[in-house]
């Protein structure tokens, strides 16, 4: 297989390397300070810190004659494009992900670039109360969550989906991928079947927002997100998408 620049900024499933090696690709890890060489390797996995680091590594790949690049981005980029009025880029994570995605797509006239957008496991902001990684509040004998949700993807599906983009992705095309769309309440019911779960009324968002702000203040922390927007809108939004056509394009049934 030809040399491939494989770029991702978030942790991928443990079995990802095993899956891509079956396809004849051997991912190598490079950090921003490394001298990169593309003459004897099949792929490079690069942990970029920002769009400038990403541009640097892509430029090196192009200079070395690499013809193909695949970037793994967060599905949040999809929702940022779909809902421009929500201004999701106010959150630094969304801004960074979107900037990096746009930066690598800008090279599509010099190198074949495909993007895989998957729901990635990354730490939720400290401003959000969570239970088992799900936005929720623990009460005496029940859980309170929000009337929202987002797409999910399993480790095996994530590895297979990204591999499909590596093998079959077209230049300049973005592929949003997921297994299913899940609401916070259903995720908690699945994880904690013996605990009752209720959805916190949206009109009382300000109660939890004030509590979150107070908790941060006691911990000596400053909010990195707009808590008002977070609790008034974002946690009650269903960030769902249907990737049926995308999966068909990649060879899935």
Name the predicted role of every residue range.
Residues 1-43, 52:
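N-terminal Rossmann/SDR dinucleotide-binding element
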Residues 161-225, 243, 248:
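Mid/C-terminal beta-alpha module of Rossmann-like enzyme folds, strongest
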Residues 8, 48, 70-74, 117-119, ...:
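Active-site beta-alpha turn of Rossmann-fold NAD(P)-dependent dehydrogenases/reductases
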Residues 43, 56-95, 114:
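Conserved Rossmann-fold NAD(P)-dependent oxidoreductase catalytic core, especially the SDR/UDP-sugar
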Residues 80-122, 141-142:
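Catalytic helix-loop patch of NAD(P)-dependent Rossmann-fold dehydrogenases
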Residues 112-157:
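NAD(P)-dependent short-chain dehydrogenase/reductase
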Residues 2, 17-20, 38, 236-253:
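Amphipathic terminal alpha-helices
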Residues 95, 150-153, 241:
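Residue-level signal for the nucleotide or nucleotide-sugar donor/cofactor binding architecture
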